[in-house]
């Protein structure tokens, strides 16, 4: 199992990798540019080389990039849609240039339209954004959401429909990223042992766990079914340490990368959360039933 954390570039790709390595992470996630700006510069080739060297030094793999917060490929608003397609193409190009293994994207909001229209809009947007890309090893990961309002991704079936339709329109590899906080907020029981078994059975049946390449490890400030996406420190939210122990030690998940996106309220919070995650993953308690 590879455990890691979201780190920030602070103007330097190398900084993000060095931070992850210094924290003792085995994998990490970054934004390839500002998460709140439509346009971004192409990464500096020198910085890419330094990033690769830092990754090799600390054996950091995989590298996951999270798409910026503005991209909404499910939108049918012509202005937002055009900006989203252009911005996501930039995300793809930067991820390929940097050498990332995965690019995580939220399915987006279909406000004013139907779920089916939103799914179709996302798939078509991904097709347009990825047209003509050079050969690469990048896989795009659809992240589950808290399922609030008109946001896609709160149900496994929606993620599956997006992937299936996208596969008909493009050769771009598509998988999934599951966020523990989002799962709980969307109504999945991942807290109890029977609930976790049921959730994983559903994920296997609908998504195929082999297609779930990354997990985001976040506790939740709100209870199950709240549809509110607010991350908490590991063990301090409504998921709790015991549930994370079951998740991290489950036989079907032990080879998955888990990446923290927990709050930083005080200096040292990143290290503390990562150390807690490592401790829970290394627990000697009996493994749950398959």
Swiss-Prot record:
Q: Please cite one Gene Ontology biological process associated with this protein.
A: base-excision repair
User: By its UniProt entry, which Pfam families does this protein fall under?
Assistant: AP_endonuc_2
> Where Zn(2+) 2 is bound, by residue?
143, 179, 216, 261
Taxonomy, superkingdom: Bacteria
Cofactor names from the entry are: Zn(2+)
Q: What reaction does this catalyse?
A: Endonucleolytic cleavage to 5'-phosphooligonucleotide end-products
Residues bound to Zn(2+) 1 are 66, 106, 143
GO MF: deoxyribonuclease IV (phage-T4-induced) activity; DNA binding; DNA-(apurinic or apyrimidinic site) endonuclease activity; phosphoric diester hydrolase activity; zinc ion binding
Q: Among its keywords, does the record have Cell wall biogenesis/degradation?
A: no
Listed as disulfide-bonded, the cysteine pairs are: none
Key word Zinc present in the record? yes
Keywords from the named record = DNA damage, DNA repair, Endonuclease, Hydrolase, Metal-binding, Nuclease, Zinc
Query: Which PROSITE patterns does its entry note?
Result: AP_NUCLEASE_F2_3, AP_NUCLEASE_F2_4
Cofactor binding notes? Binds 3 Zn(2+) ions.
Binding-site list for Zn(2+) 3: 182, 229, 231
Q: What is its EC number?
A: 3.1.21.2
Q: Which InterPro entries match?
A: AP_endonuc_2 (IPR001719), AP_endonuc_F2_Zn_BS (IPR018246), Xyl_isomerase-like_sf (IPR036237), Xyl_isomerase-like_TIM-brl (IPR013022)
Q: Which family does it belong to?
A: Belongs to the AP endonuclease 2 family.
Listed PANTHER family: APURINIC-APYRIMIDINIC ENDONUCLEASE, ENDONUCLEASE IV ENDODEOXYRIBONUCLEASE IV
**Function, as annotated:** Endonuclease IV plays a role in DNA repair. It cleaves phosphodiester bonds at apurinic or apyrimidinic (AP) sites, generating a 3'-hydroxyl group and a 5'-terminal sugar phosphate.
Protein name from the UniProt record: Probable endonuclease 4
Q: Which organism is it from?
A: Solibacter usitatus (strain Ellin6076)
């Amino acid at each position: 199992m590879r455990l890691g954390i979201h780190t920030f570039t602070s103007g330097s790709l190398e900084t993000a990798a060095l931070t992850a390595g210094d924290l003792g992470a085995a994998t990490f996630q970054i934004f390839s540019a500002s998460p709140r700006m439509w346009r971004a510069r192409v990464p500096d080739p020198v910085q890419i080389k330094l990033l690769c060297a830092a990754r090799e030094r600390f054996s950091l793999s995989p590298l996951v990039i999270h798409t910026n917060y503005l991209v909404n490929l499910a939108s049918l608003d012509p202005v937002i849609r055009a900006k989203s397609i252009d911005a996501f193409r930039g995300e793809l190009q930067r991820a390929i240039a940097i050498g990332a293994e995965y690019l995580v994207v939220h399915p987006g909001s279909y406000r004013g339209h139907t779920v089916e229209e939103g799914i179709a809009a996302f798939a078509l947007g991904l097709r347009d954004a990825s047209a003509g890309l050079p050969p690469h090893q990048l896989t795009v990961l659809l992240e589950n959401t808290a399922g609030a309002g008109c946001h896609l991704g709160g149900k496994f079936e929606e993620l599956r429909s997006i992937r299936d339709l996208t596969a008909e329109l493009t050769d771009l590899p598509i998988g999934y990223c599951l966020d523990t906080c989002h799962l709980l907020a969307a109504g999945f029981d991942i807290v109890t042992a029977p609930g976790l078994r049921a959730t994983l059975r559903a994920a296997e049946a609908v998504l195929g766990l082999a297609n779930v390449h990354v997990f985001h490890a976040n506790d939740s400030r709100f209870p199950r079914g709240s549809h509110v996406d607010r991350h908490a420190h590991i063990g301090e939210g409504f998921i709790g340490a015991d549930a994370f122990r079951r998740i991290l030690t489950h036989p079907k998940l032990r080879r998955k990368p888990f990446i923290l996106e927990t709050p930083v309220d005080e200096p040292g919070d990143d290290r503390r959360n990562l150390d807690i995650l490592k401790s829970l993953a290394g627990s000697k308690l009996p493994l749950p039933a398959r």
